[in-house]
A protein has these predicted regions:
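An N-terminal, globular interaction/scaffold subdomain
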Residues: 52-53, 59-60, 67-126
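A charged, amphipathic alpha-helical module
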Residues: 2-68, 184-232
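Short, well-ordered coil/turn elements that cap or connect secondary structure elements
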Residues: 65, 84, 153-155
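A structural signal for short, well-ordered beta-strand segments and their strand-loop junctions
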Residues: 71-72, 89-93, 137-138, 159-162, ...
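Charge-dense, low-complexity intrinsically disordered segments
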Residues: 105, 169, 173, 193, ...
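Acidic/His-rich segments in extracytoplasmic proteins that coordinate ligands and/or metal ions
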Residues: 121-188
């Protein structure tokens, strides 16, 4: 190994250490603010503990070892299919200024913050939540999602879904074909077939989760908007 290679490795190690320290510190502040809010239900505790485990402790999510994790970059990713195939969807929205700062040096300047944050998380590679994902599902809803899919494909298996923006038959037919392609990929990964029964159960579960999420969001009217640590 040359001296230049050693310097590069040392630089990458320092960058990862700074990223992990800053990201963890930021997560601690935000979680503390959330815990200090009044009126939050006790049922919120497991979610806060999970966030603390992943973003402060830098640990993997509590997913069984025999259940593959599938990263998703949009709410339009069909979680029902992922659950029905025996996998676990993980939302990777990349809302992190720390990751954005890293990605800002890796992608073109005109790229949007979402692209830069996504690249930052993947290039630093310190988050177990990202490393544990065996596949990424990226619904292409804008130009930045196209860029994200291209970047991720160099490091993970990526399935793109071109969500129709018009009600034309050709667009809908293409989207349906891509959904069937995603089903095949999921079944190959998990070794399980998506059946009517498994899909029905998954749809009921995600529907119930969406309903509970809407109830949770209603608490915003009662407790107000949480101030950011910087503004506090």
């Amino acid at each position: 190994m040359t001296e230049a290679d050693l310097r590069l490795r040392e630089r990458e190690a320092r960058m990862k250490e700074r990223f992990q320290r800053k990201s963890s510190h930021t997560s601690v502040r935000y979680l503390r603010r959330m815990k200090e809010l009044g009126g939050a239900p006790e049922e919120l505790t497991p979610f806060l503990e999970t966030l603390d485990q992943i973003y402060t402790g830098m640990e993997s999510a509590d997913i069984p070892a025999d259940v593959p994790a599938v990263g998703t970059y949009c709410v339009m990713a069909p979680q029902e299919l992922i659950y029905a195939a025996g996998a676990r969807p993980v939302k990777l929205c990349s809302g992190s200024y720390t990751a954005f700062s890293v990605g800002d040096d890796e992608v073109p300047r005109d790229a949007c913050p979402l692209v830069k944050a996504a690249e930052g998380f993947m290039s630093v590679d310190t988050m177990p939540l990202y490393r544990d994902c065996r596949m990424m599902v990226v619904p292409v809803t804008c130009d930045c999602k196209k860029k994200i899919a291209g970047m991720l494909s160099a490091k993970r298996e990526v399935v793109t879904l071109h969500v129709p923006v018009k009600k034309e038959d050709s667009d809908i037919e293409l989207y349906v074909e891509e959904l069937y392609f995603l089903m095949e990929k999921l079944e190959d990964m998990t070794g399980r077939r998506i059946t009517y029964e498994s899909l029905t159960a998954a749809m009921r579960m995600t529907g119930r989760a969406s309903y509970e999420l809407s109830r949770f969001l209603s608490y915003k009217k009662q407790i107000g908007v949480c101030e950011t640590p910087e503004a506090a």
